[in-house]
From Swiss-Prot:
Reactions catalysed according to its record: acetate + ATP + CoA = acetyl-CoA + AMP + diphosphate
CDD domains cross-referenced by the UniProt entry: ACS
Residues binding ATP: 397-399, 421-426, 512, 528, 539
Record protein name field: Acetyl-coenzyme A synthetase
GO annotation, cellular component aspect: cytosol
The entry's keywords: Acetylation, ATP-binding, Ligase, Magnesium, Metal-binding, Nucleotide-binding
Cofactor: Mg(2+)
N6-acetyllysine modification, residue list: 625
PANTHER family associated with the record: ACETYL-COENZYME A SYNTHETASE, ACETYL-COENZYME A SYNTHETASE 1
GO biological processes: acetyl-CoA biosynthetic process from acetate
NCBIfam families given in the database record: Ac_CoA_lig_AcsA, PRK00174.1
Amino acid sequence: MSAIESVLHERRQFAPPAAVEKAAAISGMAAYRALAEEAERDYEGFWARLARETLEWRKPFGKVLDETNAPFYKWFEDGELNASYNCLDRHVAAGLGERVAVIFEADDGTVTRVTYADLLARVSRFANALKKRGVGRGDRVVIYIPMSVEGIVAMQACARIGATHSVVFGGFSSKSLHERIVDVGATALVTADEQMRGGKTLPLKSIADEALAMGGCDAVKTVVVYRRTGGNVDWHAGRDVWMHEMVANESDACEPEWVGAEHPLFILYTSGSTGKPKGVQHSTAGYLLWVAQTMKWTFDWKPDDVFWCTADIGWVTGHSYITYGPLAVGATQVVFEGVPTYPNAGRFWKMIGDHKVTVFYTAPTAIRSLIKAAEADDRVHPRSYDLSSLRIIGTVGEPINPEAWIWYHKNVGQARCPIVDTWWQTETGGHMITPLPGATPTVPGSCTLPLPGIMAAVVDETGQDVPNGQGGILVVKRPWPAMARTIWGDPERFKKSYFPEELGGRLYLAGDGTVRDKETGYFTIMGRIDDVLNVSGHRLGTMEIESALVSHELVAEAAVVGRPDDTTGEAVVAFVVLKRSRPEGEEAAALAKTLRDWVGKEIGPIAKPKDIRFGDNLPKTRSGKIMRRLLRSLAKGEAITQDTSTLENPAILEQLAEVR
């Protein structure tokens, strides 16, 4: 991997705005370096201090880190606490019960505000109801529910009684849901009659019934149904229960179950490169510490902020920066049921103005799709809305290409809001490498520097450090509290996937090709290792080619994959969405040549795509991620055999397959 070629030559740099720097928790690079040096000097002492300052413990911990069974690390093991107590009770006890915890905006625009006192009461009622159905400490509860206050309540209620939740995104198929219910050994399922997104309904209860009928789900004795739309559902008496009926007569008080620091808070499934999905298991204390700390550092959270993370609670971003991080610090946050393009592509910008959002966190895919819409229709351009409340904006989920970064900075951040381009993963629990809004000069396309206490590095295939400016593999050299503890039921897979013997067995393998800038040391993520192309012996990250394509004035979005080639070993195949209508015939051929030459000029002849296909869109999941594995099959001319249940736009596959 040391031969990966970094072809990003971004030199634009943006200093933190003076007003943000002056008021920031970490103000200036000297403050950042002081924290990083504290962690290097006394690693365990650094984390112990944060854990004592950030969390409220029922029983204080004595031992900080146990490395005796590496890589199955344990943090604060002899301490006891409760995540729900730290997210709710302590704020109410501090006199913040009337502070708004959640501003919920439904798909149709209806707005509901829930205070911390209200949320605590709702969580307690549901926790009591679950206990009466026999759910308790150590049980696993699968949650298959729309974006809703009820989803947050269900997660927090599980944490309150010591049950471990496993949230399944509301767009997954019955087969995918079944796999997760069986793998995790769930005893209860929480779902809804239907989901509302973009003016359309999805029958979640019917899908859940199909999953449970596939066999192997006998342990599921309770199915709780949240009535979202009032749609008709099949009913299994004795097993199924309406959420509103279940909690109607329950007490508003529920004593938290005090659990050990290492108690599994949740299991979240993430795709593996091969085989079945991996159930990533997270601890209670280490995870909660880090999502709270990164709210304070990355987002520079202040008590008067209105925070909005646009993710779904079915993904780790929604766990960390909706259900747990904001509530752990006592934040007011927006939670949104819908999609950014309904009823039009100005929805995000309108909501920022309506709710006076100060910190906004979304995905590059959403930004790119909204760029295309804004450039086609000024009515949905950010400049048509009041975004004056914003002070910090962020990105999550994938690297953001420099052109999209600049557009976001100029049009959404109005050239006055720092962008926190955050790199992290399901397995890391929270942010790992990111600018700090009041400290780090930002560079478009770079996630800049690791947070204090995160010992990230770039190494070759043998685990040896590579010089700055030379590409390699991103690793983390020391354990951190929020890291995943294991893969549920498969510790060997955990070791092989994340701590491979080829790297010595002690380095956390992130799986991303990365390069550090020669001068600044900034990290730039170049794409997954399996998204690295080997063309004529030259290794190129897909992000660089995509960035070059998107920098062309006609291109809105691009995704690049490889396919075997007899001459070059691997050929570059690009799928491109234009800012105008899709070309065909001779026009398409001429434009493909133009873009090939453009990439050759931007990067070099070696990176020229051999095949460019134009589509009206790219195949994406309902959470907005590009489904690159499908593009690889299309590029090779193979039939699509993979699970497409999470695909938002199935018709696009036929369109892209037709184009040659």
